[in-house]
């Protein structure tokens, strides 16, 4: 297996490599938060690419245990049901890049799988808005379907640029695709002018 030959824990590592070759997100010295990290392929790539002076600032998060990776801090928690545990672990830390390769267990029904992954994307976006530095970037995996455009519009509130990207290493027949948001904007006022904000009922 190619991933094992190159020392990566999963073939998904090549997806992040493809994404970074296109968008140049993982620059030296940047701080990275990796959501849904297990088994660790993305965290490995991130740590390699942002390392500076032998050190990297990468925090990996997953509900499942993960074997240690050099230069990666691991937080084991369920961000869907216990996000307060992650907040307690991170405290007031801020990141330049938030990555999410999270995916629910597939039930085999395309529409249900799509709705479930959109829920995870929304949760990842909430955490990105909370922990990103101004100007930062966000990458999340989605499955194409009914709610993808609505979610894309949510990203556009927070990022100056939102782009679809399908890595070369993704299977061509898969509905999996990534959304990449760059230039995180207005972290304190995500809707820009007050008239753009949704009204309260």
From Swiss-Prot:
Residues at the catalytic site: 141 (proton acceptor)
Annotated binding of S-adenosyl-L-methionine, by residue: 40, 42, 62, 78, 101
Catalytic activity: uridine(2552) in 23S rRNA + S-adenosyl-L-methionine = 2'-O-methyluridine(2552) in 23S rRNA + S-adenosyl-L-homocysteine + H(+)
Any one annotated GO CC term: cytoplasm
Entries under InterPro entries matching the protein: RNA_methyltr_RlmE, RNA_MeTrfase_FtsJ_dom, rRNA-MeTfrase_E, SAM-dependent_MTases_sf
PANTHER family: RIBOSOMAL RNA METHYLTRANSFERASE, RRNA METHYLTRANSFERASE 2, MITOCHONDRIAL
Protein name according to UniProt: Ribosomal RNA large subunit methyltransferase E
